[in-house]
């Protein structure tokens, strides 16, 4: 060995040289004297083993096979068993002895035999297979460093080789370590070294055997260490890979679980959504079914309503065509009248009628004054009757005295018997006179109420009175000779004369009443005639305003506004020449002109208590429907013509509320709501007033009359219902309504007298007037009345509803 310290361990022909600061120059095996050189063989064996290890490492790295930690230990046991078998096979004489040079510090291992080399190659290949992954120069499991030796093939032996090398025919590879500083070896020194080696061979054989065993142990330890390091390293890698694999598997499982949970949540949410959608669909289905049913019902209802409207439209078209025809006829009639030039004549007649109206008013006032005088005369007659009653009572007392004196006288004489008879006759006459007095008293009372009431009864009493008076006169003449009855005779004569005077006076009053009634009838007919003539003139201006200019009418007549009531007032208007010979039931008997009485105000007042939607009201509105069509049209025309405002049809609930407000305002209590509702309901159809059948102003007047005729409000009512119509008109139309032809109501005192007189007059009409005609002609169809109703009308109305300005 040289100065530099070097450590060398050898086993199985391997020489491990550890030298600091020197390079490997050559590794030669030490050859015995009688054998071949072992160094080249050993070096070639090492080279082959290293190549095999590298090949195995390359294959293992290419295949990428992963061995478990448990496989390292059987491989280690297999390698140890193969090494022991090789040791048994190798004889002692085949042990190579390594030579070491003191100068170069090179230890040369003698190469083994070829067979051993083959066995060693197999073992080394197996070891290399077990430790292929750890030949990476890492010091984690071993402190040794393996490096690939350089094989040097020398074709010619160098000069400085030993004699044993010269004898060798084959070149041998060897590991070389080159040192930093190299000593030159002379031939003499090499020879000396060989000689010394040969001398020390016997002593080193024992060392060689020991070193070979030691090398085996070292190799075994190295193999064990390498295998343990490989196993440890591979185990750690496998554990890490397993851990990574487990983590990856856990992560995958967690991801799968998350995906599954999210999918389950989505499925659950979709299931809930499906349920809600199903419920919504069911609800929508039910709603669509209900809507479909309602649509079908509505469709059927609309179809029926459409059919009904078509039928009603056809009817209305027919009615409209008929109305248009009637309108054309009326226009033709108006044109005919205009062509004849009757407009100026009508104006003249109207002026004459106004003059007659003034005269009639004066006569009416005189008639009222005469009636007052008659009432005062009736009171005077009542007083005279009281006086006559007192006289009769005095005569009765005298008769009783005379009868008593005659009874106390002689009863057997024949004169007494005759006197008794005369007394009995006088008593009978006295009772008759008393009966007459009581009757006359009753008749005078009736005369105070109404002087026309007892016409037939007074006639009967006149005849009865004449007969009884005749009897009394005959008996008085026969017995006038009697002296004791002279005073009685005088009293009876006075009574007879007074009764005759009373009857005569009463008869004269009855005649005067008849004449007053006739005169009243005449006045009434004349006033109606004047009114008719006036409206006749106004109807001419409705359809053609130019007619007045063409025929020279007055400016006032031309400027009069058109009204819808002209057609209502004259539904059957014709020329006077055409209808002059067709007025049978309504002509007057005194040869005067005809007097049409078709006027709304009078008919309304006469039939206000008997009006019903089925009879009188329809008669009132028969001609009004010619001027308007339908409830709305008639209501608007009436409101425009009377109040200059457009109003919709009056509703029943609104009208009832107005009546209730007025009653609560004017009266403390009103107990006839049910009766009033029954009366009002007759004039409303489906809650709306029948404007096409009756005028609303007429209806208000009917309600007013109905309330006045109640017994509770006939006397001492202080005019509670006087302002009812104004209150109703103010509510519906904004202002009150003033009748265009003067006041339609008398004053309060006159109205009370008229109401009381009308009651008794109705009783008298049952006896005085004949039965009405069963068929009164065509005028009765449109509300015409007979003469009896016309005669009573003035008494009920009091002051006539006319004004001289018209």
Curated annotation (Swiss-Prot):
Residues 1-307 are annotated as: Interaction with MCF2L and SRC. The modification Phosphoserine is found at residue 186. It comes from the Eukaryota. Residues 190-207, 457-467 have a biased composition (Basic and acidic residues). Residues 1-216 are cytoplasmic. Residues 80-105, 152-207, 457-478, 758-778 are annotated as: Disordered. It is found in: Cytoplasmic granule membrane. It is a single-pass type II membrane protein. Residues 175-184, 468-478 have a biased composition (Basic residues). GO terms for cellular component: membrane. Keywords: Cell cycle, Coiled coil, Membrane, Phosphoprotein, Signal-anchor, Transmembrane, Transmembrane helix. Residues 305-449, 503-529 form a coiled coil. The chain crosses the membrane at residues 217-237. Residues 238-806 are lumenal. PANTHER family: CELL CYCLE PROGRESSION PROTEIN 1. Acts as an assembly platform for Rho protein signaling complexes. Limits guanine nucleotide exchange activity of MCF2L toward RHOA, which results in an inhibition of both its transcriptional activation ability and its transforming activity. Does not inhibit activity of MCF2L toward CDC42, or activity of MCF2 toward either RHOA or CDC42. May be involved in cell cycle regulation. Interacts with MCF2L. May interact with MCF2, ARHGEF1, BCR, VAV1 and FGD1, but not with TIAM1. Interacts with GTP-bound CDC42 and SRC. Belongs to the CCPG1 family. This is Cell cycle progression protein 1. The lineage of its organism: Eukaryota, Metazoa, Chordata, Craniata, Vertebrata. The gene is CCPG1.
């Amino acid at each position: 060995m040289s100065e530099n310290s070097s450590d060398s361990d050898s086993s199985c022909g391997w020489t491990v040289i550890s030298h600091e600061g020197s390079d490997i120059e050559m590794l030669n095996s030490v050859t015995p004297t009688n054998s071949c050189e072992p160094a080249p063989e050993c070096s070639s064996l090492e080279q082959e083993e290293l190549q095999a290890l590298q090949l195995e490492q390359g294959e293992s790295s290419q295949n990428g096979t992963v061995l478990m930690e448990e496989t390292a230990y059987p491989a280690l046991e297999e390698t140890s068993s193969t090494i022991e078998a090789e040791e048994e096979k190798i004889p002692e004489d085949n042990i190579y002895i390594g030579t070491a040079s003191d100068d170069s510090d090179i230890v040369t291992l003698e190469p083994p035999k070829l067979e051993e080399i083959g066995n060693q190659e197999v073992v080394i290949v197996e070891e290399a297979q077990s430790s292929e992954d750890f030949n990476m120069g890492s010091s984690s499991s071993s402190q040794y460093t393996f490096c690939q030796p350089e094989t040097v093939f020398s074709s010619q032996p160098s000069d400085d080789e030993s004699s044993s090398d010269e004898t060798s025919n084959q070149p041998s590879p060897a590991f070389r370590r080159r040192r930093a500083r190299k000593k030159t070896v002379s031939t003499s020194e090499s020879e000396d070294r060989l000689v010394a080696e040969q001398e020390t061979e016997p002593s080193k054989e024992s060392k060689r055997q020991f070193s070979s065993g030691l090398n085996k142990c070292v190799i075994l330890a190295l193999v064990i260490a390498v295998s343990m390091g490989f196993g440890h390293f591979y185990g750690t890698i496998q554990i890490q890979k397993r851990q990574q694999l487990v983590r990856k598997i856990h992560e995958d499982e967690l991801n799968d679980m998350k995906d599954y949970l999210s999918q389950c949540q989505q499925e659950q949410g979709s299931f809930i959504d499906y349920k809600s959608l199903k419920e919504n669909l069911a609800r929508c289905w039910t709603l669509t079914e209900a809507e479909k049913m309602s649509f079908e019902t509505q469709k059927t209802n609309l179809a029926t309503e459409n059919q009904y409207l078509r039928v009603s439209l056809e009817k209305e078209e027919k009615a409209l065509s008929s109305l248009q025809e009637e309108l054309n006829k009326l226009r033709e009639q108006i044109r005919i009248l205009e062509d004849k030039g009757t407009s100026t004549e009508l104006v003249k007649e109207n002026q004459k009628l106004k003059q007659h109206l003034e005269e009639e008013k004066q006569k009416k006032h005189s008639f009222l004054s005469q009636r007052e005088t008659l009432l005062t005369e009736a009171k005077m007659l009542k007083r005279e009757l009281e006086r006559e009653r007192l006289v009769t009572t005095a005569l009765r007392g005298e008769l009783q005295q005379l009868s008593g004196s005659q009874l106390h006288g002689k009863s057997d004489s024949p004169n007494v018997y005759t006197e008794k008879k005369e007394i009995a006759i006088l008593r009978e006459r006295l009772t008759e006179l008393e009966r007459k007095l009581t009757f006359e008293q009753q008749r005078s009372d009736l005369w105070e109420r109404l002087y026309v009431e007892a016409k037939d009864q007074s006639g009967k009493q006149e005849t009865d009175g004449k007969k009884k008076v005749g009897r009394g006169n005959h008996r008085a003449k026969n017995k006038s000779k009697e002296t004791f009855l002279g005073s009685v005779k005088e009293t009876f004569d006075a009574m007879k004369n007074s009764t005759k005077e009373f009857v005569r006076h009463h008869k004269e009053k009855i005649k005067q009443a008849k004449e007053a009634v006739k005169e009243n009838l005449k006045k009434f007919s004349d006033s109606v005639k004047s009114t008719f003539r006036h409206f006749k003139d106004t109807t001419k201006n409705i359809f053609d305003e130019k007619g007045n200019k063409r025929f020279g009418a007055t400016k006032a007549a031309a400027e009069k506004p058109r009204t819808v009531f002209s057609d209502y007032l004259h539904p059957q208007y014709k020329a006077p020449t055409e209808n002059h010979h067709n007025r049978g039931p309504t002509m007057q008997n005194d040869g005067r002109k005809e007097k049409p009485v078709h006027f709304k105000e009078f008919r309304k007042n006469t039939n206000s208590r008997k009006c019903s939607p089925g009879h009188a009201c329809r008669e009132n509105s028969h001609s009004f429907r010619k001027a308007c069509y339908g409830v709305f049209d008639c209501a608007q025309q009436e409101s425009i013509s009377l109040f200059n405002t457009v109003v919709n049809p009056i509703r029943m609930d609104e009208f009832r509320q107005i009546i209730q407000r007025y009653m609560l305002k004017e009266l403390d209590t009103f107990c006839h709501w049910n009766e009033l509702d029954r009366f009002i309901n007759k004039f409303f159809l489906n809650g709306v007033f029948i404007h096409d059948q009756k005028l609303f102003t007429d209806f208000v007047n009917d309600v007013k009359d109905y309330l006045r005729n109640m017994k509770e409000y006939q006397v001492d009512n202080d005019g509670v219902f006087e302002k009812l119509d104004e209150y109703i008109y103010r509510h519906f139309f904004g202002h009150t309504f003033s009748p265009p032809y003067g006041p339609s109501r008398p004053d309060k005192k006159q109205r009370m007298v008229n109401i009381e007189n009308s009651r008794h007059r109705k009783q008298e009409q049952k006896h005085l007037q004949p039965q009405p005609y069963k068929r009164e002609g065509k005028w009765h169809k449109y509300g015409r009345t007979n003469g009896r109703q016309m005669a009573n009308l003035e008494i009920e109305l009091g002051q006539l509803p006319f004004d001289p300005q018209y």
